[in-house]
């Protein structure tokens, strides 16, 4: 087995093509050699292009490539100032959506993912992964620009693949269609029971299904591209059991662990997983469960609070606990039709603004292309917007029109000359006769090829049958 020194030398030899060492002046007999012009040029350009954010490698050398961060902690929205601004002002607010509607949409999307995972018989980890991906995605994109119904189905489909419990798009579509019908029944005041849901059947495979499936696949690709394919999630569920075992409540108080587990799953409807680490969330769930069970207990608080041993502050624990308590203060489920109508109105306004901006840009470009001293006299309508343009704005169109007119004149003169000398009808008759002959030849060739092909197939089948009867060991069937 090679020693550590040999392994290190081998590694240094392998990375020589990928890294560049800093040129240092050599010392000979205490005197420093003067730097060459090439070395000075290389060192100056190297220092200019140096990236101070890249940490040195294990061999004391600096790589030329940048760092690629695939850690899921990069999605904590409280690490830098830019992320804090984004979590306080999501992209949906820029498009005119209110803060209350935006929070209702997040709650509605996560609730649909949770119920869909139950109907698809997915594990709870898959449901948690889908909800966290949904939250991450809509902190980068707007609810107004991208339909949340497509994102919900895409998150379910993607989470099932991540947790190695894949489901087909058809199954996801059936489940979402059923959830939508159940929500309509609930909003209309009907009770959800076997009698009201007996007539619910899976939707037919029609164009609506094909379009929805295509939207689902496109949304899945868009989510992956937006998140940079960093879709793995750290779930705090195992940490709850580990912390409970450390506190000694695993065997004595299983109700606290169950209540903490429930708080963890319900907290997925909020954005606490975008703000805090899993260790902090696990401590907050245990902290809240120990105070809200039937027989509350006091967890260790001297000489310091028990959660400080897990690198968690009391401020974060209290903030998460208050957010979870506020979640249970919600009395009504979000009204899906009302939210959808509000989003459609905002989308129509946004589309009208984009059309107006585009029409203005086109008008400005046409004004620049028009010759000086000429003013536009006609209008061109795009959607509901109109703009004035010059009738002679495109020379290509004008030239093409003149060429068409010239061609028509030539055809008219040719027909007149043929009629005068009496040769027009005869020429047309000869042309038709020639076309018919060509068609007959083509049909004759096709029939000949098909007959020869049928003859070959028939002979081959007869030869195969003879060979089978000859090689078969079964006695021939008697004739009656």
Swiss-Prot record:
Protein name, as recorded: Cyclin L homolog cyl-1
Keywords: Cyclin
Superkingdom as given in the UniProt entry: Eukaryota
UniProt feature, compositional bias: Basic and acidic residues: 33-44, 384-409, 418-442, 454-472
SMART domains per UniProt: CYCLIN (SM00385)
Compositional bias annotation for Polar residues: 45-58
GO BP: nematode male tail tip morphogenesis; regulation of transcription by RNA polymerase II
Free-text disruption phenotype from the record: RNAi-mediated knockdown causes abnormal male tail morphology.
Family membership: Belongs to the cyclin family.
GO cellular component terms, A-Z: nucleus
Described function: Involved in pre-mRNA splicing. Functions in association with cyclin-dependent kinases (CDKs). Involved in induction of expression of heat shock protein hsp-16.2 in response to heat shock. Plays a role in male tail development, perhaps acting together with cell cycle regulators cdc-25.2, cdk-1, cyb-3, and cyd-1.
One term of GO molecular function: cyclin-dependent protein serine/threonine kinase regulator activity
Pfam families linked to this entry: Cyclin_N
Domain spans labelled Cyclin N-terminal: 91-230
């Amino acid at each position: 087995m090679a020693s550590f020194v040999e392994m290190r030398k081998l590694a240094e030899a392998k990375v020589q093509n990928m890294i560049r060492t800093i040129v240092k002046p050599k010392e000979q007999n205490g005197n420093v050699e003067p730097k060459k012009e090439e070395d000075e040029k290389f060192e100056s350009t190297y220092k200019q292009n140096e990236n101070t954010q890249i940490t040195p490698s294990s061999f004391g050398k600096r790589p030329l490539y940048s760092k690629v961060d695939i850690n899921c902690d990069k999605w904590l929205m409280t690490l830098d100032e830019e992320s804090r601004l984004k979590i306080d002002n999501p992209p949906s607010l820029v498009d005119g959506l209110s803060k209350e509607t935006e929070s209702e949409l997040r709650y509605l999307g996560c609730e649909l993912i949770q119920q869909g995972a139950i109907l698809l018989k997915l594990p709870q980890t898959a449901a948690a992964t889908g909800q966290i991906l949904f939250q991450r995605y809509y902190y980068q994109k707007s609810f107004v620009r991208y339909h949340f119904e497509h994102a919900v189905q895409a998150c379910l489909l993607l989470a099932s693949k991540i947790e190695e419990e894949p489901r087909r798009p058809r199954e996801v579509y059936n489940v979402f269609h059923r959830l939508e019908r159940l929500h309509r029944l609930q909003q209309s005041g009907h009770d959800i029971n076997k009698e009201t849901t007996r007539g619910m059947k899976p939707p037919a495979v029609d164009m609506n299904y094909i379009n929805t499936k295509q939207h689902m696949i496109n949304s899945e690709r868009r989510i992956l591209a937006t998140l940079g394919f960093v879709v793995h999630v750290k779930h705090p569920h195992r940490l709850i059991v580990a912390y409970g075992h450390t506190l000694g409540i695993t065997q004595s108080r299983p109700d606290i662990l169950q209540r903490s587990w429930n708080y963890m799953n319900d907290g997925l409807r909020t954005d606490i997983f975008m703000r805090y680490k899993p260790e902090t969330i696990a401590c907050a769930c245990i902290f809240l469960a120990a105070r809200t069970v039937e027989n509350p207990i006091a967890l260790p608080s001297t000489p310091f609070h028990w959660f400080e041993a897990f690198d968690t502050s009391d401020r974060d624990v209290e903030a998460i606990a208050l957010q979870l308590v506020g979640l249970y203060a919600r009395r009504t489920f979000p009204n899906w039709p009302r939210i959808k109508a509000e989003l459609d109105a905002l989308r129509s306004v946004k589309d009208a603004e984009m059309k107006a901006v585009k029409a203005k840009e086109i008008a400005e470009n046409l004004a620049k292309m028009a010759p000086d001293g000429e003013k536009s006299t006609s209008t061109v309508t795009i959607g509901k917007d109109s703009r004035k343009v010059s009738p002679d704005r495109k020379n290509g169109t004008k030239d093409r029109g003149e060429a068409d007119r010239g061609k028509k004149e030539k055809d008219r003169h040719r027909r007149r000359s043929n009629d005068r000398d009496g040769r027009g009808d005869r020429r047309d008759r000869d042309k038709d006769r020639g076309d018919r002959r060509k068609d007959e030849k083509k049909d004759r060739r096709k029939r000949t090829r098909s007959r020869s092909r049928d003859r070959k197939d028939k002979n081959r089948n007869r030869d195969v049958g003879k060979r089978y009867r000859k090689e078969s060991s079964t006695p021939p069937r008697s004739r009656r």
